[in-house]
Regions:
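Active-site cavity-forming subdomains of large catalytic enzyme subunits
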Residues: 1-65, 71-74, 82-87, 107-108
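Active-site nucleophile and cofactor-binding loops and adjacent substrate-binding regions
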Residues: 1-3, 26-28, 54-59, 187-188, ...
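Acidic, glycine-rich active-site loops and adjacent beta-strand->loop/helix elements
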Residues: 1-4, 26-32, 58-59, 85-87, ...
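Short beta-strand segments
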Residues: 23-27, 80-84, 161-162, 211-212, ...
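Glycine/charged-rich beta-loop-alpha catalytic/anionic-binding loops adjacent to active sites
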Residues: 27, 46-54, 277-282, 320-333, ...
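Thiamine diphosphate
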Residues: 31-34, 323-462, 468-474
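Flexible, low-complexity linker and terminal segments
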Residues: 55-292, 435, 446-447, 455, ...
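Active-site diphosphate/adenylate-binding microenvironment
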Residues: 269-340, 349
Length: 557
């Protein structure tokens, strides 16, 4: 979904063309394993007239990346390289080659050519005409792309168009059904635009099955071309329901569709005998020691104390797990930056004295797309509380740096921009608080929310602490020993606050209702000592003060 944010320049660059090479890599997510929707970004290829390449496997992904750079440089146009989940998550041995970077390097000079680079109407109109001509030529010539091809038997009367990873599924399905000498397989790695020569190869067989992940984009192009040339071929795929319009494909699903077209009997392989047993539920949880847990715990307590039922506008990050019990502090999760944006509208229509609006957003997401909606909140006077969860990194996707980390993607130091600087610059009152300090959190959140309710204006709280995974890594690097915590047997009353309300994964309930801490899971954050009403939790031994410093300040290296 990241290409949505870059769509505006993509359309414009398609008009102007590029110097050097520009390859946009888009990782689509069929079945939405980690995305909020299942969009197929090949539509951008059609919409913006951008050549779209789909690798069929790991080696192809390597070759496709090289070829994408070469074609972009040769055509002087942007190229979209599309991957899907199985391609992105597959490993295999690679045959490495050499990319001639010198050949791909731009000149390093800016060519003053306003008629090309300024998209005012009189120039943009000319660009569109050239773009349409380029697109027509590309449809005629792109069939010779090295990763395209035709294999199998011509004149068999049945063709499979395998697109990207769909080509691999198609080959396995053909083998499973024993149709190797009875089918023509058309391998399409340039899915947009569909090469006309490959389309003709498929249509000549009379029966065609299009296998592609995502939307029926190649299928739609093929059907349009068939109408254009008057072909009577029957084309099957997703539009007729033979293949599913949602989720990932599987060999079994493709084999069942192929068997149906070929008139074969085929029973899809099912799982083993149903023993009537269910695996124990394993819901995703925030890590032991995660700074989000004390924030959400404190937020719930403050809302209860002020006798309000907030509407929580969430965002994209590890903190999306706040939707789950016992916290349930995510009522809306739409897209990156959607928290403050949604809160803007809600704050104007809800009775905030009973249902105050609280936006929850991470630091990297705030820099990415949270600043503009906060500006709108100021401009439109939206009474909302925005909580920026600052863990000094982009945790969910692999600890990438951002403008608040003081480090660039190449590892070099960079100016560090605190969220508070930005918020103050927008004229918004901002509070900063230690995310591991329960008392400080509750006091700060209560003051901030009360100010929103009384003064009806936006207020921001920045809750700060390190991602526990980064902190643990830093501690190991420094040779620091992490001291776990334990339950003091005689003091625990079995109230359940630590394992039910605070819900630390390292703490469990014993048969007698008392708490028990697993030292293998405990990260030594010590927040449980603050939430226990009976002072029944303590460290196993002396805690090195350096650890508490690292917990609050560690950043990825």
């Amino acid at each position: 979904v990241g290409l949505n944010v870059a769509a505006d320049p993509l359309f414009s660059i398609s008009y102007t063309g590029v110097e050097g090479a520009l390859v946009v890599v888009s990782a689509d997510d069929p079945w939405m394993w980690s995305s909020q929707n299942e969009q197929d970004n090949r539509w951008y290829g059609l919409h913006a007239y951008v050549l779209t390449i789909e690798p069929t496997g790991p080696q192809d992904a390597l070759e496709a990346a090289k070829l994408a750079l070469e074609y972009s440089s040769k055509l002087k146009r942007p190229v979209l390289l599309r991957s899907t989940t199985r391609i992105s998550h597959t490993r295999a041995p690679q045959r490495l080659g050499r990319i001639d970077l010198e050949k791909l390097k731009p000149s390093g000079k800016f060519h003053h050519d306003p008629s090309r680079w300024t998209l005012i109407p009189q120039y943009a109109r000319r660009h569109k005409l050239r773009l349409v001509e380029y697109w027509e030529e590309l449809q005629e010539s792109i069939h010779d792309f090295p990763l395209n091809g035709v294999e199998g038997v011509r004149g068999s009367g049945l063709a499979i168009v395998g697109v990207g990873i769909g080509y691999r599924y198609a080959r396995e399905a053909v083998k499973k059904l024993g149709l190797e000498d009875q089918v023509l397989i058309v391998r399409v790695s340039t899915s947009v635009p569909l090469p006309r020569k490959l389309a003709e190869d498929a249509l000549e067989e009379g029966l065609v099955l299009v296998v592609e992940e995502g939307d029926p984009i190649v299928e739609t192009q093929l059907k349009a071309y068939a109408l254009e040339v008057g072909s009577k071929a029957l084309i099957f795929g997703k539009r007729d329901g033979l293949l599913p319009l949602h989720g990932e494909l599987r060999v079994e699903v493709v084999a069942a569709a192929l068997a149906r077209i070929a008139g074969l009997e085929y029973e899809e392989v099912r799982g083993g005998e149903d023993l009537g047993l269910e695996l124990p539920p394993r819901p995703p949880v925030m890590c032991p020691g995660c700074l989000y847990r004390p924030i959400f715990y404190s937020l719930k307590r403050v809302a209860s104390r002020l006798r309000v039922r907030p509407v929580y506008a969430g965002d994209i990050g590890c903190y999306s797990l706040g939707i789950l019990p016992p916290f349930q502090v995510q009522d809306i999760i739409l897209e990156m930056g959607g928290s403050i944006g949604s809160a803007n509208g809600l704050a104007h229509v809800l009775d905030i004295s009973r249902e105050p609006v609280i936006a929850i957003i991470g630091d990297s997401t705030f820099y990415h797309s949270g600043i503009t909606p906060l500006l709108n909140a100021v401009y439109n006077g939206a009474p909302l509380l925005a909580i920026v969860l600052d863990n000094h990194t982009t945790a969910m996707t692999g600890h990438q740096p951002h403008p608040g980390t003081g480090r660039r993607a190449d590892g070099h130091e960079a100016p560090r921009i605190d969220p508070e600087q930005i918020v103050k610059g927008l004229g918004v009152e901002v509070y900063s608080v230690d995310a591991f300090d329960i008392r400080g959190l509750e006091e700060t959140l209560a003051n901030a929310l009360s100010k929103v309710l009384k003064e009806r204006k936006p207020v921001v709280v920045v809750a700060r602490g390190a991602c526990i995974l980064v902190a643990l890594s830093e501690a190991r690097r420094k040779g620091l020993r992490i001291t776990p915590y334990r339950v003091v047997e005689g003091r625990c009353k079995g109230c359940g606050v630590c394992y039910n309300l605070f819900a630390c994964p390292a703490i469990s309930r014993r048969r007698d209702g008392k708490a028990e801490i697993d030292p293998a899971l405990c990260t030594g954050c010590g927040v449980c000592t603050q939430v226990c009403p009976f002072n029944a939790i303590s460290p196993v031994e002396h805690v090195d003060p350096e650890w508490h410093k690292i917990m609050r300040t560690a950043k990825p290296r």
